[in-house]
């Protein structure tokens, strides 16, 4: 396998904190709805690029998160040009690790056996008129 690349179009969703409830004396944890649906969408897109056999060895991941431009950026021609060139980057919450958590979870048992196999990870945040998440996965050779 050379590499797996795919793009998830639409506004990226950061992994939210799990919600807990007690039923019949037991604690049940669940994903917030937005996170759950985003993971399902990522899995749907990734399933079109899945390898013939699930990857069982170490992998590297490169994730680029393109967030929608806020009005403060899109209303200013200079800021918009800088953002489109990648010179003006989002430094506000959510953090990059919260974006990638959902993506990694969505790929479990689909691309790789478990997200613990990710040994190299690069995540970048950008602004764009076309919000999306670009994912590239490579097997790491020993």
Swiss-Prot record:
Task: List the biased-composition ranges (Basic and acidic residues).
Answer: 81-94
A matching Pfam family: RusA
GO MF annotation list: magnesium ion binding
What processes does the entry annotate via GO biological process terms?
DNA recombination; DNA repair
Span-the-membrane segments of this chain are none
Q: Where is this region: Disordered?
A: 70-94
Q: What is this protein called?
A: Uncharacterized protein YqaN
Q: Which organism is it from?
A: Bacillus subtilis (strain 168)
Provide the taxonomic classification: Bacteria, Bacillati, Bacillota, Bacilli, Bacillales
């Amino acid at each position: 396998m050379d590499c797996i690349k795919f793009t998830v179009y639409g506004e990226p969703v950061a992994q939210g904190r799990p919600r807990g409830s007690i039923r019949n004396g037991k604690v049940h944890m669940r994903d917030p709805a937005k996170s759950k649906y985003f993971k399902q969408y990522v899995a749907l897109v990734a399933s079109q690029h899945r390898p013939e056999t699930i990857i069982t060895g170490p992998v590297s991941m490169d994730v680029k998160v393109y967030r929608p431009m806020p009005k403060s950026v899109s209303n200013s021609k200079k800021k918009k040009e800088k953002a489109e060139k990648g010179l003006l980057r989002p430094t506000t919450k959510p953090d990059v690790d919260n974006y990638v958590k959902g993506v990694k979870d969505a790929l479990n048992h689909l691309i790789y056996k478990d997200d613990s196999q990710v040994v190299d990870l690069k995540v970048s945040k950008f602004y764009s008129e076309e919000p999306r998440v670009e994912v590239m996965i490579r097997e790491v050779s020993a």
